[in-house]
Amino acid sequence: MGKEKYIEIKGARANNLKNIDVKIPQGKFVAITGVSGSGKSSLAFDTLYAEGQRRYVESLSSYARQFLGRMSKPECDFIKGLPPAIAIEQKVISRNPRSTVGTSTEIYEYLRLLFARIGKTYSPISGQEVKRHTTEDVLACTQQFSKGTKFVILAPLHIVEGRSLEKQLEMYLQEGYARILVKGEFIRIDDFQGDAKPEDIFLVIDRASVSDEKDDISRLIDSAETAFYEGDGACRLLFLPSNISYDFSTRFEADGITFEEPTDNMFAFNSPLGACPTCEGFGSVIGIDEKLVIPNTSMSLYDGCVVCWRGEKMGMWLKEFIRRAEPYNFPIFKPYYELTQKEKDWLWHGLPSDKKRDPHDRVSIDEFFRMVKENQYKIQYRVMLSRFRGKTICPDCHGTRLKKEANYVKIGGKSITELVDMSITNLSAWFQKLELTEHEREVGKRLLSEITHRLQFLLDVGLGYLTLNRLSNSLSGGESQRINLTTSLGSSLVGSVYILDEPSIGLHSRDTDRLIKVLRELQQLGNTVVVVEHDEEIMRAADYLIDIGPDAGRLGGRLVYAGPSSEYSSTDPEQQKSLLEKFPESHTIQYLTHKEEIAVPASHRAWNRAIEIKGARMNNLRGIDVRIPLNIFTVITGVSGSGKSSLIKGILYPALRRHLDLVADAPGEYSSLEGDVDAIKHVEFVDQNPIGKSTRSNPATYLKAYDAIRTLFANQPLAKQMGFTPQFFSFNTEGGRCEECKGAGYVTIEMQFMADLTLTCEACKGKRFKHDILEVHYGGKNINDVLNMTVNEAIEFFSDERLQHHVGDFDACRIIVSKLKPLQEVGLGYIKLGQNSSTLSGGENQRVKLAYFIGKEDQSPTLFIFDEPTTGLHFHDIKRLLHAFQALIERGHSLVVIEHNLDVIKCADHIIDLGPEGGDKGGNLVIAGTPEEVVACKTSLTGKFLKNYIK
């Protein structure tokens, strides 16, 4: 056994790190943990990754470096033993509307190559395989017949451009040919009277009989080559006396159509050679949107589901369609969503009887809008057309993005577009069962290996419910990160350090085991895997744990624990006691040894009012009815892809907003919203998007604390003397702000050929305000000093009554402290008041919003929806978050939380578990009830894992 190697970091000082020394074992699986804001990311990304990136850039040529700029050294004394560093963060991979799961994982590139190499083209008319024929095919055809069977080798008449039929026949005579076949009759060329079309004439190349003699076979091959030459690539065998004929062509054609031979670009929707010419590879066009024409699919045709056919005048179209549809037994009373595809086609494109009618006498939705377009010169028709226009599936490629020729190429009976529309689970199973010839398997060996391995990686990280056609910009941050992880695994790099930011985000406990397996695979390739993580399973699975703390901001930044998993995984009470005495400041060790824990509530709140969603059918939801109780803490659970977001974000939230007459996106398909809907006066979706509408937004402005801070500074003697009103202390309006950077503290230089450059403003040195504004002090601090305080520091500072010397100071300070206290309550005491919203993590943004609502007074009954609020939270932070949740409920509000964290789930009053699996195996209501009832449900995967948390 060789000596263990380490990545050694000496004197790390980035952000709040307190000059710490850390040793990370090389080639191991290492977890870095700690409460939010303790300095984990500062160590992992701002120190470890930043130095790895800097060294990489420094290793490039001076020519390449001039485009990348000089990267500053991270704040530390030195780092030894650092391999090349790769960071995989929670960022959506691409905003490119063409980027998909398939392209970002490179699986689609391998599929394109596979279809180009072994794909077979089939004619859409006859379904026969299209192929180029050779003389070998001609020979093989003759071998089907018994020896001695006579046949004639023919070439279709090919007239060279500029020649007449007579001249061409004369040329054949000169070349030694004597006979032609005209309409089934053999005649001599010099006897031809010229009373036939050229396409009915064949040149007789040779007469022969079926034989296995070497000389006869050689003669047949020569004759076939001559026939292909004279017939411009075409040849015909006519067997006698049966008159059975077989056509051959060296051209890639069948059924009179010349097909395009498969190439990899033929399947590329990013290339003009493969993209659908109508939608240019996007899969959608601006057209008549089905969702706008039929917004409520639970209505029937008779009830008026077709919005544009309502009213006295337009209702004539509906009456006429119903009259004509009667012979076809069209179900006019059936809800639209229950109609078959055939019935929907009749409604949209016309009844079978309409095909015989004049186009202007047809009745369908398509014909209706054709009429509207013809009357666009009238204002009312232009308005109607714009009302129903939207992004809709391309009518030519039906959303496949590729030109129609690409779908003629198949492997195992499936086209590439059929494969990318399968879920990854089904696609992986399809490849396992795929039957290929020995030659095809040999040609596609490497490609098949890459495809199946990468599909397995996606399954291992819990993404089996996605399709390869899913747009990258529609993925969550956690899904994007796991896709990045599978791409890294696929590249098979070794000797690197991978740094991941909470890879378990969005994962059900069932999938965490698979993720650990993937991380282990990455490590066993010869890499060091460093994860910034709070998930207990991942911490216990790691080889080594580093805990930064003990608390957030200036109270953190120290190394409170570093050691192998064997230390904290021990169940020996003496060993646990010794560990706690040795590392008393580590909250992580206290939770892992169960000294501290999040208690299960003694009882659950009863409820008697609820909102009921009936017939939820969005995405994979199976027409389920769900009751969401009010005035209690409800958690929505289920594996990834089970339908949680579709139900809550896709249906409940927009439907409630519309009920409250607020602007909202169109909700997903559902039948009705019932129950105590009127008991809700507001609905708030607290997501992880940046706070505020402006990039200048920060925690102080978002929580309205900055108004009181500006008033306080304007109340100081110097400010009054200089005539500075509160407006002068705003960085959003002219007056006191630095006009060079418009109060941002930095300037952005647009670089035409590379990413924009952000530099500290030279005029104000990053302080945002003019010099005379910065001369105004309160308690020895100017406005810039206050903006650079953490929330904890600010609360302490503004609570100090010794500094409140002037009339109005006390009231302003009281307001500031009351506005900032909720931030402390949700565990964000470490963030700075003036911290730019773009630098806050998703979890931090969500908790700033939560703090805002906790701080609001006189709020009418509100339904709060949270999407994975524990993202980025340590056990210690989750405890605080749950207290904040209880505070909202005690004020009479209702809480609905989409969550995977079992510590949160066990504290719920009511659980709605969807599943049982993801994708097409999900979308059902598995169980709804208390945590104990969910644990008792044998089909609930959530219950299976929750069992260990409820004692």
Where are these regions (language model features)?
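Conserved phosphate-binding elements of NTP-dependent enzyme cores
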Residues: M1-K951
